[in-house]
A protein has these predicted regions:
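N-terminal secretory signal peptides that target proteins for export/translocation
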Residues: 1-4
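Bacterial N-terminal signal peptides
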Residues: 8-19
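Solvent-exposed helix-loop boundary motif
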Residues: 24-116, 133-160, 167-234, 264, ...
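Periplasmic/extracellular electron-transfer cofactor-ligation site
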Residues: 39-62, 124-134, 389-404, 544-545, ...
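Catalytic cores of secreted or luminal carbohydrate-active enzymes
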Residues: 109-128, 632-639, 643, 647-648
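Mature extracytoplasmic enzyme cores
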Residues: 119, 163-167, 247
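Primarily short, surface-exposed interaction patches in extracytoplasmic proteins
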Residues: 229-303, 314-588, 623-624, 644-703, ...
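Long, His/Glu/Asp-enriched segments that create or flank divalent metal/ion-associated functional microenvironments
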Residues: 581, 589, 597-598, 602, ...
Length: 720
C-alpha cells in the first residue's frame, strides 16, 4: 500500500489497519487507546519524539495534534520496521519501550506492565486506526472534583471518560496530570494528589484525549476553629470574601489607617504619591466619607487618565518601532482620550475591533497594525479582551485548555478580510472580500466562529468583525467581563482572582469563583463603566485592609485577608523619586516636565525604567512588565548618580526645605509626609533629629542623607 498515491489509500489503510485477523479480545485501536498511552508515556512530548525534528529518526506530532500522521509514522514509515505484524512481540516499538534494545527515553513500559500489554494487543489486533461502531468520547470528569483537605493529606483521583452511548470508563491510567501550584499541591503520574502546607485553594488538571477536567482542593488553616468577628460590609465584595475566609479558618486584618489608605489609593488610581500638603489635608479631615470622596476626586484628575492610558498602551501595544512615531502618538492619544472621557469598556473594545477607514480619522485602527498577521491579531484579541491564551493552538491542541487548531484558525478568520490601502486621507483600514481559511493540516475550510462556539455552515455576511464584537460584548459572554474585572482586581489587590490574569481557562479556576462572578455581573450591570468599578473595588473593606498580618493570615497571599505588598511600577517609582526630591526627570525627545507615567513612547531609552521592568510592548502579556524586586534595583537606588544629583540639586526640594525651615522637626515631618504620606513616629522623629543635630555644620547634606535613606526604604519602594 503506497500512501503517496492519495488520501483514499491512506483512509483505506486507516480503516482496516493491517490485513490481520482481529483477536477476540476487548477492542483496542489507535485513536482511543494508543494515542492516549503514547501521550501518557511522554512519547509525543516536545522533549522527545514530539520535538520539531523528531528524535532519532522518529517524529510524532506534539500532543498528538496530527493522529493520522502519527499513525503513518508508527506503522508505515521506514518500511514499517517499527511494527512486526507476524511476530508482534518482536516489534521494534515493543523492544524499545521495554528496554530490550537501546532507547534514548529509557524503559517506558516493562514487559509485565499494563502499557506493554495494550501495545501488544493493538499489534495483535492488526493495528487498527479506528474500530467502527465504537462510541466517541464526549467529556471526562474527575472523582472527586472538589474537596476540603488538610495539610500533607493525600487524595487519589479517578478520571472517568464519558462516551456518546452514555457509557463511562475509568481512564486514570491513560491520563496526564498537572498541578497548577506545586507549592500548594503536587500530583504524581498515578493521579495521587499530595497537599502541601499552604492555606488556600488550588487545582489539579487531568487530560485525556484532548479533554480536560479539574479537581479543586480547599485547604483551611489547621488548628482550632477561630471565632470569626462581626465585620461591617462596605459593599457586596466583603461578605463574599468573608465567607471564603471563614472556610479557610482565617480572620482578616483590620482596616488600614488613613495615611496608608491615602498613599495606596493615590498610587493605584493616579499613579503618583500625594504631596505633603495633600497628605496633611486628608489626615486632618474628620468627616466620615472622606475615603470615598478622595476616590471620586482622584478619578476626575488628569493623572488618572495619564496612568490608565499607560496601562492600556501596554496592553494595546503602542509601539513606535512598530507603528512609527506619529502614528503611535495618534494611537496613544485615542486611548488617553477614551479613558479621560470614561468610555465604556465594551465600547472601547468594539471600536478597536471594528475600526475602518483612514487611520488619521480612526486611530483605533492602529490596533491592527500592532499585529504582525491575522494569527497574531486573533491571539492579541483573545488575550487582551478575553483573557484566553490561544497561541499554543496555532500548531497543536492546547495542552492545558480545550482549544484546538480549528478554534485558533476560526478566530483568525474574523480578521482575514482586513487590509490596508492608501487613500486620499492616508493609510486606510478596510474589511472586504470573503477570503477562506483552511486547516493547515487537513486542508478543510474553516468558517469563522468565536471561542467555545460551533462552526457555522456558511461564513458571516459583511464585515465578520461585527459578529465577533457582538459576541464578545454580549452580557452573557463567559470571558469578556470576567477578564476585565480580574485585571482590575489584580491591579488594586496585588493578585488576580485568576493568576496569571490573562490565562482564563477551565483548568485554572479562580481562587474565589463567587467573587469573580459577582464582579463580572456588576461590571455588566454598570454598563462596563471603568470608574464605577474602581469605586466599587476601592470602597470595599477588602481593599482597605491593613497589610499587617495577624496570627491566622501571616502566610496568606491568595485569599485577600490582608493587603499585599506591591513594588511600585517603574514609571511610578521614577516619578516618586522626582516628587520627593522636587527635581523633574529629563527624558529624551520630550520637554522637561513630563512625568514618566505620561511617556507614551515605550522606546524612550532610560536606564532606571528598564531596570525596574518597563515593558517594551513586544507582546500583550502582562508578564512583560517586571514587578519583582532585585539586587540590581536596590544597588541602583543606593548608588545612582542621577538620584544623588537630584538630592543635591540647587533648585530641588532639599535645598528649599533647609532654607524655609529652621526647625529640624519640620524638615523631618515634611520628608516623611512626602515619601510615606504620614508623619514620623516618635522614634523616627528622634532618630531624624539626632542625625540632623549631629551634622549641624553640614545641615543640607544631612537632610539629603535623610531623604536618601527614606527613598531606599521598603516602605517607599512598595505600595502596602
Amino acid at each position: 500500500m503506497i500512501i503517496a498515491r492519495g488520501a483514499g489509500v491512506l483512509l483505506a489503510m486507516i480503516c482496516i489497519g493491517f490485513a490481520l485477523p482481529v483477536h477476540a479480545t476487548s477492542p483496542v485501536d489507535f485513536t482511543n487507546d494508543i494515542i492516549p498511552l503514547m501521550s501518557r508515556l511522554g512519547c509525543n512530548a516536545s522533549a522527545c519524539h514530539g520535538k520539531a525534528e523528531g528524535q532519532n529518526g522518529f517524529k510524532l506530532s506534539v500532543f498528538a495534534h496530527d493522529p493520522v500522521g502519527d499513525f503513518r509514522a508508527l506503522t508505515r514509515e521506514s518500511r514499517g520496521r517499527r511494527i512486526s505484524p507476524t511476530a508482534p512481540a518482536d516489534s521494534l516499538l515493543l523492544r524499545k519501550i521495554s528496554g530490550a534494545v537501546g532507547h534514548g527515553g529509557g524503559v517506558r513500559a516493562p514487559r509485565n506492565s499494563r502499557a506493554y500489554s495494550l501495545f501488544l494487543q493493538w499489534i495483535k489486533n492488526g493495528t487498527p486506526y479506528e474500530i467502527g461502531g465504537r462510541p466517541t468520547l464526549t467529556r471526562i470528569r474527575l472523582e472527586p472534583s472538589r474537596q476540603t483537605a488538610a495539610f500533607n493529606a493525600s487524595q487519589p483521583l479517578k478520571v472517568m471518560a464519558e462516551f456518546s452511548d452514555n457509557t463511562h470508563r475509568d481512564v486514570t491510567w491513560l491520563s496526564i496530570f498537572h498541578s497548577n501550584d506545586t507549592g500548594m499541591a503536587t500530583v504524581d503520574e498515578k493521579g495521587i494528589v499530595t497537599i502541601g502546607n499552604s492555606v488556600g485553594q488550588t487545582s489539579v488538571m487531568a487530560r485525556y484525549q484532548g479533554k480536560v477536567a479539574t479537581f479543586q482542593a480547599i485547604v483551611p488553616r489547621p488548628g482550632p476553629k477561630v471565632t470569626y468577628p462581626h465585620l461591617p460590609n462596605h459593599n457586596f465584595i466583603d461578605p463574599i470574601v468573608d465567607s471564603h475566609l471563614k472556610r479557610l479558618n482565617i480572620i482578616p486584618s483590620p482596616l488600614s489607617d488613613d495615611a496608608t489608605f491615602l498613599r495606596r489609593v493615590y498610587l493605584d488610581i493616579a499613579g503618583r504619591l500625594p504631596t505633603a500638603n495633600e497628605s496633611e489635608t486628608f489626615l486632618s479631615d474628620s468627616t466620615s466619607g472622606k475615603r470615598s470622596g478622595l476616590v471620586d476626586a482622584l478619578l476626575e484628575t488628569p493623572e488618572f487618565a495619564d496612568y490608565w492610558a499607560l496601562k492600556w498602551a501596554d496592553l494595546l501595544r503602542v509601539d513606535r518601532l512598530k507603528l512609527g512615531h506619529e502614528d503611535a502618538h495618534r494611537y496613544y492619544k485615542w486611548i488617553h482620550e477614551s479613558l479621560s472621557k470614561n468610555k465604556p469598556l465594551d465600547h472601547l473594545a468594539r471600536e478597536l475591533l471594528t475600526a475602518e477607514g483612514p487611520l488619521t480619522e480612526q486611530p483605533a485602527g492602529f490596533f491592527y497594525r500592532a499585529a504582525n498577521n491575522t494569527g497574531d491579531m486573533a491571539a492579541m484579541v483573545s488575550q487582551v479582551f478575553l483573557g484566553v491564551r490561544i497561541t499554543c493552538a496555532e500548531c497543536h491542541q492546547h495542552p492545558y485548555d480545550r482549544w484546538t487548531q480549528q478554534d485558533y484558525h476560526a478566530m483568525r478568520g474574523f480578521f482575514q478580510q482586513v487590509t490596508t490601502k492608501n487613500s486620499a486621507g492616508g493609510l486606510a483600514l478596510l474589511a472586504e472580500g470573503n477570503p477562506t481559511i483552511k486547516h493547515p493540516r487537513t486542508g478543510a475550510i474553516i468558517q469563522p466562529y468565536p471561542l467555545g462556539e460551533s462552526m457555522p455552515e456558511e461564513p458571516p455576511q459583511g464585515d465578520r468583525r461585527h459578529v465577533l464584537a457582538n459576541w464578545m460584548t454580549h452580557p452573557e459572554n463567559p470571558y469578556f467581563a470576567r477578564n476585565l474585572v480580574n485585571r482590575l482586581w489584580a491591579h488594586f489587590l496585588g493578585k488576580g482572582l485568576i493568576t496569571p490574569v490573562d490565562d482564563l481557562r477551565e483548568t485554572n479556576p479562580p481562587s474565589n469563583p463567587e467573587l469573580l462572578d459577582a464582579l463580572a455581573a456588576s461590571l455588566v450591570k454598570n454598563n462596563y463603566d471603568l470608574k464605577k468599578m474602581i469605586r466599587i473595588i476601592t470602597h470595599s473593606r477588602t481593599y482597605q485592609l491593613s497589610s499587617k498580618p495577624n496570627a491566622t493570615n501571616l502566610s496568606d497571599e491568595q485569599n485577600f485577608s490582608r493587603a499585599l505588598f506591591r513594588r511600585l511600577p517603574a514609571e511610578v517609582l521614577m516619578d516618586a523619586v522626582c516628587d520627593v526630591t522636587g527635581v523633574d526627570e529629563k527624558f529624551d525627545g520630550v520637554p522637561r516636565g513630563y512625568r514618566a507615567v505620561q511617556l507614551w513612547d515605550s522606546q524612550v531609552q532610560h536606564y532606571f525604567l528598564k531596570l525596574f521592568g518597563r515593558p517594551a510592548r513586544a507582546t500583550v502579556c502582562e508578564c512583560e512588565r517586571v514587578t519583582g524586586a532585585s539586587m540590581g534595583q536596590a544597588l541602583h537606588l543606593m548608588n545612582s548618580p542621577n538620584i544623588q544629583t537630584k538630592l543635591a540639586h540647587e533648585g530641588g526640594r532639599i535645598k528649599r526645605l533647609t532654607l524655609e525651615h529652621e526647625d529640624d522637626a519640620d524638615i523631618v515631618r515634611q520628608l516623611y509626609l512626602s515619601a510615606f504620606s504620614r508623619s514620623p513616629s516618635r522614634d523616627e522623629m528622634n532618630t531624624g533629629l539626632q542625625y540632623l543635630g549631629s551634622r549641624r555644620f553640614q545641615r543640607r547634606k544631612a537632610v539629603e542623607d535623610l531623604a536618601w535613606s527614606l527613598m531606599n526604604s521598603f516602605e517607599f519602594i512598595f505600595n502596602h
